[in-house]
């Protein structure tokens, strides 16, 4: 059972319009050797910013989330830049297709595709189809270079929610 403030926050998130985005976390799961579906029992916090999501690449690993139903909190925190972590949050019960980790520009990356249940086929399918790697690379590569060249001055603990496992 959720306490009142947690339930109020969840109710708020459900009212926020879903957004299609490529976002990031700073934790990857090194155990999969082949793609697999995973379910998120809790909220999944991701960020538009590689630097924020990884605490300036504290560990050289980036989880990439491709989805259509995350709730973008960035506009709500526009007036509070010190607290705006460019967060896109997925609701509890969201499913992802998790791919094995791979190397890219000296960083270990892991792709997660958000899934939805197709009512006709009763199979899970990606919510957003990308035509190849280009959209991911166009989002990721400049951010990796910028994070290495000019790390952000982040408050202590700002990235913590992006650095923990999904379970």
Language model features with spans:
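Mono-ADP-ribosyltransferase
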Residues: 1-167
């Amino acid at each position: 059972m959720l306490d009142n403030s947690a339930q109020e926050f969840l109710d708020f998130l459900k009212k926020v319009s879903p957004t299609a985005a490529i976002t990031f976390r700073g934790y990857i799961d090194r155990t999969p050797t082949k793609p697999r579906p995973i379910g998120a029992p809790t909220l999944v916090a991701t960020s538009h910013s590689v630097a924020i999501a990884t605490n300036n690449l504290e560990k050289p690993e980036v989880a990439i989330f491709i989805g259509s139903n995350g709730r973008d909190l960035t506009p709500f925190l526009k007036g509070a830049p010190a607290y705006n972590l460019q967060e896109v949050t997925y609701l509890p019960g969201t499913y992802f297709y998790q791919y094995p980790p791979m190397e890219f520009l000296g960083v270990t990356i892991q792709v997660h595709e958000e899934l939805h249940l197709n009512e006709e086929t009763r199979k899970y399918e990606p919510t957003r189809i990308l035509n190849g790697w280009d959209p991911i690379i166009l989002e990721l590569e400049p951010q990796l270079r910028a994070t290495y060249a000019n790390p952000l001055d982040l408050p202590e603990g700002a990235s913590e929610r992006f650095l923990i496992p999904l379970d």
